[in-house]
């Protein structure tokens, strides 16, 4: 991969730099895996912490056909920022007013007859036809219409189509074990999904598109691609199957801050609250001005490394709300105040990765990149040619 050095912007305490060139590259990789299927790029949770509007623009330019979000509010935010591409929202609280979504040409996925009724109420109030996808539960047991309620959903949709209240767009579901491509549950869900499509056809309903595959299935189960695939985490360059390595993707996010202070301490002195870490010899320290209020997990205290001037430096002592400390080692000081410290990034320069953090935390890299907040400013590198 061609690496362009990243430097801190003046006056910025800490940055999450999103490389739009990596987004472009990853979308093109996913398009290759998708074959004849179109791409719906998933932008929920502010594009997994990467910034929904900028990622949407980059993904659409790279060939994504549609966008997907969890909530209507997320879809409306894209519309407010001028994004006109098809966008689907699929997670709705009871009593939601779908009117603003219809007026903004947002497609709606419904998981129950009650949700469909609420949507049809908005159709009557606004005079707008709703573009509807049915979200079916094929085994995940989250949102999605359950099997025994599916016939009632189809009957209600038939009436709505006849009344021109609904344009029937799609059938979607979500896999339980997509990160385990060979798990037999994927085949079971695939068969259930195919049966639901057939059941709708028998009842005279034709979905324009069907989609089941998330990132991992897009890259490892071409037999489940159908008409559309819904990659999420892979768009951001994070492997949907970590046991298979990076899968040819480039992580888009680099988190960094400036060294706020450098100081020397004597052997026997402690660092941070409780002095959990005691210097075994004279050493030098660097203070980094980010903490658990910014998404640097407190449980990483004394466990994470950062990259400063080409070297991995271990964190020492407890991570505080606003700051933490790394050990520079004894002898001549090779770090100055204002130098760049990389908390995690693609790993190309030896820095830790989001997956490294996830491994330390016993979690997944999704949680790492979506937890950044507080005083970490998100900035962007414009899309450019990325070689790998």
Curated annotation (Swiss-Prot):
List the CDD domains: PLPDE_III_AR
Q: Which positions in this protein are listed as binding substrate?
A: 142, 321
Q: Which residues carry this modification: N6-(pyridoxal phosphate)lysine?
A: 44
Q: Which GO terms describe its biological process?
A: D-alanine biosynthetic process; peptidoglycan biosynthetic process
What domain of life?
Bacteria
Q: What is its EC number?
A: 5.1.1.1
Query: Which residues act catalytically here?
Result: 44, 273
> Which SMART domains does the annotation name?
Ala_racemase_C
Q: Does the keyword Manganese apply?
A: no
The pathway entry for this protein reads as: Amino-acid biosynthesis; D-alanine biosynthesis; D-alanine from L-alanine: step 1/1
Keywords for this protein: Isomerase, Pyridoxal phosphate
Q: Does the keyword Isomerase apply?
A: yes
The cross-references to Gene3D superfamilies, in alphabetical order and at most eight, read: Alanine racemase, Lyase, Ornithine Decarboxylase, Chain A, domain 1
Write down the top EC class of this protein.
isomerase
Catalyses: L-alanine = D-alanine
Which cofactors is this protein said to need?
Answer: pyridoxal 5'-phosphate
Q: Which family does it belong to?
A: Belongs to the alanine racemase family.
Question: Which PANTHER family is this protein grouped with?
Answer: ALANINE RACEMASE, ALANINE RACEMASE, CATABOLIC-RELATED
What does the function comment of this entry state? Catalyzes the interconversion of L-alanine and D-alanine. May also act on other amino acids.
**Protein name, as recorded:** Alanine racemase
Provenance organism: Mycobacterium leprae (strain TN)
Q: What is the lineage of its organism?
A: Bacteria, Bacillati, Actinomycetota, Actinomycetes, Mycobacteriales
Identify the gene encoding this protein. Answer: alr
């Amino acid at each position: 991969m061609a690496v362009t050095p990243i430097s801190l912007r003046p006056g910025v305490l800490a940055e999450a730099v999103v490389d739009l060139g990596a987004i472009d590259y990853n979308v093109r990789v996913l398009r290759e895996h998708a074959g004849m299927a179109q791409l719906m790029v998933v932008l929920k949770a502010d594009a997994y912490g990467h910034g929904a509007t900028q990622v949407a623009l980059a993904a659409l330019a790279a060939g994504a056909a549609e966008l997907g979000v969890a909530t209507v509010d997320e879809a409306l935010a894209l519309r407010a920022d001028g994004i006109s591409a098809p966008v689907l929202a699929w997670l709705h609280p009871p009593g939601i007013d779908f009117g603003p979504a219809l007026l903004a040409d947002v497609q709606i996925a419904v998981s129950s007859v009650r949700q469909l009724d609420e949507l049809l109420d908005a159709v009557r109030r606004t005079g707008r036809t709703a573009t509807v996808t049915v979200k079916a539960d094929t085994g995940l047991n989250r949102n999605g219409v359950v099997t025994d309620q599916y016939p009632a959903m189809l009957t209600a949709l038939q009436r709505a189509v006849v009344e021109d209240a609904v344009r029937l767009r799609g059938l979607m579901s979500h896999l339980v074990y997509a990160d385990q491509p060979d798990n037999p549950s994927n085949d079971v869900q695939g068969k259930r999904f195919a049966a639901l499509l057939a059941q709708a056809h028998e009842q005279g309903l034709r979905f324009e598109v069907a989609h089941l595959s998330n990132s991992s299935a897009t890259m490892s189960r071409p037999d489940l691609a159908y008409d559309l695939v819904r990659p999420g985490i892979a768009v951001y360059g994070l492997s949907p199957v970590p046991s298979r390595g990076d899968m040819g993707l480039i992580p888009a996010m680099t988190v960094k801050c400036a060294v706020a202070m450098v100081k020397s301490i004597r052997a026997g002195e402690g660092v941070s609250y409780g002095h959990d870490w005691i210097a075994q010899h004279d050493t030098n320290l660097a203070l980094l001005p980010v903490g658990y209020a910014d998404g640097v997990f407190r449980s990483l205290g004394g466990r994470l490394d950062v990259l400063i001037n080409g070297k991995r430096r271990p964190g020492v002592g407890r991570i505080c709300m606003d700051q933490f400390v790394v050990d520079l080692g004894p002898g001549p000081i090779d770090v100055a105040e204002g130098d760049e410290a990389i908390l995690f990034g693609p790993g190309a320069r030896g820095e830790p990765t989001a997956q490294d953090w996830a491994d330390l935390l016993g979690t997944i890299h999704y949680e790492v990149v979506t937890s950044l907040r507080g005083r970490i400013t998100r900035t962007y590198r414009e899309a450019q040619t990325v070689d790998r």
